[in-house]
């Protein structure tokens, strides 16, 4: 079908945003929605995730994100939505979503603000890996591409898994 010349820009404006729909989409609860048969990441709240990290000794993977953050959707779609990566993250880390809700609710939770201050958050997305009892943490700021994110997770796994706890 041939589209008449004057309608082409209008049609392109309608279709172009559909090409960049991020995945996975999120529900109001923050749970990832993925296609059937795929293993989504079960993001924990700050409180339950911190508790689980302390109990299990696994490093916490903090995902600082916001609903309005386009680069956050790229990270979700190109890294977190990949079934193998989701399974690896669930196995090696305690994934904790730290969502900025200031635009939606007018404020952020005290827990979110405390973590943002603790790690010197400067923007979204930001990944921080920290293990309870260790003074050290690793941080990846901004969307730097799929390969950089995968490299970051691999480095964090090597650095934090199997380490003895050092007092803070």
Where are these regions (language model features)?
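Bacterial N-terminal signal peptides
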Residues: 12-22
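N-terminal leader/targeting and pre-domain segments
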Residues: 29-56
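Thiol-based oxidoreductase modules, predominantly thioredoxin-like and allied folds used
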Residues: 43, 85-109
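Short active-site neighborhood of thiol/selenol oxidoreductases, capturing the structured segment around
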Residues: 56-67
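Hydrophobic beta-strand anchors of alpha/beta hydrolase catalytic cores
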Residues: 60-62, 95, 127
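Typically the conserved alpha-helix immediately C-terminal to a functionally engaged Cys/Sec
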Residues: 73-88
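Non-catalytic, surface beta->alpha helical segment in thiol-disulfide oxidoreductase systems
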Residues: 122-162
């Amino acid at each position: 079908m041939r589209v008449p010349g004057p309608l082409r820009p209008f049609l392109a404006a309608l279709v172009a945003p559909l090409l960049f729909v991020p995945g996975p989409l999120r529900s109001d609860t923050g749970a990832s929605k993925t296609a059937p048969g795929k293993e989504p990441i079960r993001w924990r709240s700050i409180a339950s995730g911190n508790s689980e990290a302390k109990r299990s000794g696994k490093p916490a993977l903090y995902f600082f994100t916001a609903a309005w953050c386009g680069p956050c959707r790229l990270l979700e779609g190109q890294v977190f939505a990949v079934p193998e990566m989701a399974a690896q993250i669930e196995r090696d880390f305690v994934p904790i979503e730290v969502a900025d809700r200031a635009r939606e609710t007018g404020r952020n939770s005290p827990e979110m603000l405390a973590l943002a201050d603790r790690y010197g958050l400067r923007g979204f997305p930001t990944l921080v890996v920290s293990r309870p009892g260790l003074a050290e943490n690793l941080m990846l700021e901004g969307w730097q591409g799929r390969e950089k994110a995968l490299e970051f997770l691999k480095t964090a796994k090597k650095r934090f898994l199997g380490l003895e706890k050092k007092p803070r």
